[in-house]
From Swiss-Prot:
Top-level EC class as recorded in UniProt: hydrolase
UniProt protein name: Holliday junction resolvase RecU
Enzyme Commission code(s) on record: 3.1.21.10
Membership in a protein family: Belongs to the RecU family.
Site (Transition state stabilizer): 102
Compartments where found: Cytoplasm
GO BP annotations listed: chromosome segregation; DNA recombination; DNA repair
Gene assigned in the entry: recU
Length: 200
């Protein structure tokens, strides 16, 4: 299947860095991707009527479909309708929340190239309208998760654009962000941090 960006450029999945989860055997949830862990967490929040948060679908425009059999359809070509914004959005305690989820195998920093300008602009707009915007960053080698408010991401992005470093150090994330506690259910309890950072 061929997928194209809105500008017509071809999306080549093979050239994208493939994130293979690191398999660890110390407890059962290690090795899950951040997306799987957050989807599991959000399902827990929804089931227990804590919050309503969902993964945003990626909008695609189907262009070419083959029908090898009457009951089967194979998409051969599709385009991204528009650049995606962030990964998740929803409502918690009457407030709109919107966040991006990112993973890195780096030990000491998080590269800002993992963000796109339209994602930064989207987070700015959410904050301007009194929504809550943040990023959850997973350091896969340590199995550590941090919640970092959008204002810090925006500041680090601006620093990069004025000749500063092109990454956020792990020390800066530890200083400005909040370490998330992990467990079985919910896997990544980011709501507890939201209560502390935004609702206290």
């Amino acid at each position: 299947m061929t997928i194209r960006y809105p500008n017509g450029k071809r999306y080549d999945q093979a050239s994208q860095p493939h994130k293979t989860p690191i398999k660890k055997h110390t407890y059962s949830n290690r090795g899950m991707s951040l997306e799987e862990e957050l989807n599991d967490t959000n399902q827990y929040y929804l089931t227990h009527n804590i919050a309503c948060v969902h993964k945003k679908p990626t909008p695609l425009q189907i262009v070419k479909v083959d029908y090898p059999a009457r009951s089967a359809a194979v998409v051969k070509e599709a385009y991204f309708k528009q650049p995606s914004t962030t990964d998740y959005n929803g409502v918690y305690k009457g407030k709109y929340i919107d966040f991006e989820a990112k993973e890195t195998k780096n030990k000491t920093s998080f590269p800002l190239q993992n963000f796109h300008l339209h994602q930064i602009e989207h987070m700015k707009q959410v904050v301007a309208h009194n929504g809550i915007a943040f990023v959850i960053i997973k350091f896969t080698l340590f199995d550590e998760f941090y919640l970092l408010d959008a204002k810090h991401i925006i500041a680090f992005w601006n620093r990069q654009n004025t000749g500063g470093r092109k990454s956020i150090t792990k020390q800066e994330i530890e200083e400005h962000g909040s370490l998330l506690s992990c467990g079985y259910h919910p896997r990544i309890d980011y709501i507890r941090v939201l209560d502390t950072v935004y609702f206290s």
